[in-house]
């Protein structure tokens, strides 16, 4: 039986087309996702935590639109490089808060150089994980926070042409099948979304009781 429930509306805080594409896939049929208004400028992401940066982005949208806003922030954490990425992952090659993101290729090149300088060769020495935090800020002042994590390691060289960011370097563990050593950039969208930090975070959002038909969504 087809449900006639009206989907709750969220405004997406991200203007990154790669992220928006993934978010649309992950929330399809769960919410009505509106694009970020073009007139809203980029937010200076100067918080000390992923949650803090995500909140800054969501609140900027909420204050302009008056509608519930969803934002995410992602950090990569590399065991051999403590404190170097994390909240600064997207601007790793140019760590200025006013630069929300630096070119993907520059970030990947810096990471490979840093691990090479430390003579990290084995998968264990190149261990890393991603964390994505997703926040929904509501007009009534409430908020919902979920997260997702994906463990893996950094490949010795870029592989694959799909995805974005560090996808050509990150090998998730476990993969799709036993012994799978593919990077995210070598996987299909469905395979990546099943394993990735962002996929897990947004599935946690999509399955939250707040989005069920039996509960009232704060301010559609």
Where do the protein language model's features map onto the residues?
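Anionic-ligand binding patches
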Residues: 2-11, 17-220
């Amino acid at each position: 039986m087809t449900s006639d429930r009206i989907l709750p509306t969220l405004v997406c805080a991200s203007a990154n087309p790669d992220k928006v594409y993934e978010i649309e896939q992950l929330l399809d049929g769960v919410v009505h996702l509106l694009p970020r208004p073009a007139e809203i400028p980029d937010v200076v992401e100067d918080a000390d935590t992923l949650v803090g940066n995500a909140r800054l982005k969501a609140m900027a949208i909420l204050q302009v639109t008056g509608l519930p806003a969803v934002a995410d922030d992602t950090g990569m954490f590399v065991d051999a490089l403590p404190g170097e990425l994390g909240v600064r992952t997207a601007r790793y090659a140019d760590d200025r808060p006013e630069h929300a993101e630096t070119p993907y290729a520059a970030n990947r090149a810096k990471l490979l150089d840093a691990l090479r300088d430390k003579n990290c060769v084995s998968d264990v020495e190149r261990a890393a994980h991603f964390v994505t935090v997703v926040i929904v800020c509501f007009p009534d002042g409430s908020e919902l926070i979920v997260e997702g994590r994906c463990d893996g390691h950094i490949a010795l060289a870029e592989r694959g042409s799909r995805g974005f960011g560090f996808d050509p370097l990150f090998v998730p563990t476990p993969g799709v099948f036993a012994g799978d050593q593919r990077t995210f950039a070598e996987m299909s969208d469905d395979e990546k979304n099943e394993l990735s930090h962002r996929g897990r975070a947004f599935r946690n959002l999509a399955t939250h009781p707040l989005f069920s038909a039996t509960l009232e969504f704060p301010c559609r």
